[in-house]
Amino acid sequence: MAQHEVNYLKSGGLPVVLTTVDHLVNWGRSNSLWALTYGLACCAIEMMASGAGRYDFDRFGTIFRASPRQADVMIVAGTLTKKHAEFIRRLYDQMSEPKWVISMGSCANTGGMFNTYATVQGCDRIIPVDVYLPGCAPRPETLQYAVMVLQQKIRREKASRKLPPKRLV
């Protein structure tokens, strides 16, 4: 049986489902992503458009949340300054495990065209990133694709993999 295959057997006339706990847990996690939006610049406009009726993020099971305690995906969209770095780290730490991060746009990925002393050259220097979304500014369809890539990544991992990292003091 493949890792994510569900088999249906006939047992006395009743269907029986054979699968793994990892498959069931990851299926639930991947189809109910609650996103904490952290929009900082132009990419935030495209991120907001993805939640509107035309693109309808809800059909992927993605719901935008305003609180990090209710979210399991953080979408960082736009230029990250050094003043925001501590704040974004605090928001990330407040999210419960398992948690994932999507870096949206060239500015969030690499600092974009703003190579200054006040700009963080990629949000992966502050928080771990799972999916990088290139472009300036990426279209809502691209953000939907990034969510689907994240869903595939979640379905492949072990349900017990996401343990809190050891903190270095």
UniProtKB/Swiss-Prot annotation:
Membrane topology: Peripheral membrane protein
Cofactor note as given: Binds 1 [4Fe-4S] cluster.
An annotated Gene Ontology molecular function: quinone binding
Protein's GO biological process: aerobic respiration; electron transport coupled proton transport
Superkingdom of the source species: Bacteria
Reactions that this protein is recorded to catalyse: a quinone + NADH + 5 H(+)(in) = a quinol + NAD(+) + 4 H(+)(out)
Chief location category: membrane
Subcellular location: Cell inner membrane
Pfam family, one: Oxidored_q6
Binding residues for [4Fe-4S] cluster: 42-43, 107, 136
GO cellular component: plasma membrane; respiratory chain complex I
Disulfide bond residue pairs: none
Needed cofactors: [4Fe-4S] cluster
EC number: 7.1.1.-
Assigned keywords, A-Z: 4Fe-4S, Cell inner membrane, Cell membrane, Iron, Iron-sulfur, Membrane, Metal-binding, NAD, Quinone, Translocase, Transport, Ubiquinone
Function: NDH-1 shuttles electrons from NADH, via FMN and iron-sulfur (Fe-S) centers, to quinones in the respiratory chain. The immediate electron acceptor for the enzyme in this species is believed to be ubiquinone. Couples the redox reaction to proton translocation (for every two electrons transferred, four hydrogen ions are translocated across the cytoplasmic membrane), and thus conserves the redox energy in a proton gradient.
NCBIfam families in the record: nuoB_fam (TIGR01957), PRK06411.1 (NF005012)
Similarity remark: Belongs to the complex I 20 kDa subunit family.
Assembly, per entry: NDH-1 is composed of 14 different subunits. Subunits NuoB, C, D, E, F, and G constitute the peripheral sector of the complex.
Protein name: NADH-quinone oxidoreductase subunit B
Gene this chain is encoded by: nuoB
